[in-house]
């Protein structure tokens, strides 16, 4: 297959590109490098620097790269906090960018897309594990834009026959098993890399926000999914569409939750480092428990997480962070 990966220099995008190429596919990457890293792009991928909001730039890729079978769309801003203080940035980049992409896809006859969505579309869950049919009531602008992007695909399919798969995933984590690429955000907002930065000494401590939740140890419980397993799900979704599969939405998670304290303790075990912990008050909007039901993805796509053990997930992340303490920076 020949696949165009938008946002292919980012964390999940770059791992998906690696997985695609390791599976023998031809890959074209389009990224503006605002948050992505050129060093994360697989050397065998064809790279174009460009902004999705610029129609001529994405048109140019479709015109130069004949025979693209499908698009995988990761290109979006994704910081929850920033989305609340600068919502217009998220409407511009996430929604406007996707609108321009769809215009170009329709014009060039590209009719299959796999979309990187999020558990943030659900907001405060009514139950766990969360099913794809559960209500979507986002509690932040990031989740709202992702929900709106899903609706754009729905209506564009009705008008133009474009088929899509939307993958709503939970807490992405870990790194490529080789240690060549991994997670490098600035600022870092995800739990596991923050814990590992504290283990490295590049961060003074890890804060636990809330110790009085109705959970076994009082801290929030989340569903952690290895980035390589997410990458594999995107490939399976493309193959599903290539075989004529109908448009659909799938959750991606391990279906097992770990508390913040459990993740910290496992990181101490893996790294053999002392990690300073500071207990703080709850953050508003943090649900006590978020766990996905991924039964639908397993049944329909044939997806099965390969790295479903928390210790293994943290080991791959630690391999990356311990050899790249400054991420992709020299």
Please tell me what each predicted stretch does.
Residues 194-330:
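C-terminal substrate-binding subdomain of Rossmann-fold SDR/epimerase-dehydratase oxidoreductases
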Residues 8, 36-38, 50, 81, ...:
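Glycine-centered small-residue hotspots that permit tight backbone geometry or close packing
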Residues 1-172:
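N-terminal Rossmann-like NAD(P)+-binding domain of SDR-like oxidoreductases, especially those catalyzing
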Residues 127, 138-145, 184-192, 223-227:
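The catalytic Tyr-centered alpha-helix of NAD(P)H-dependent dehydrogenases
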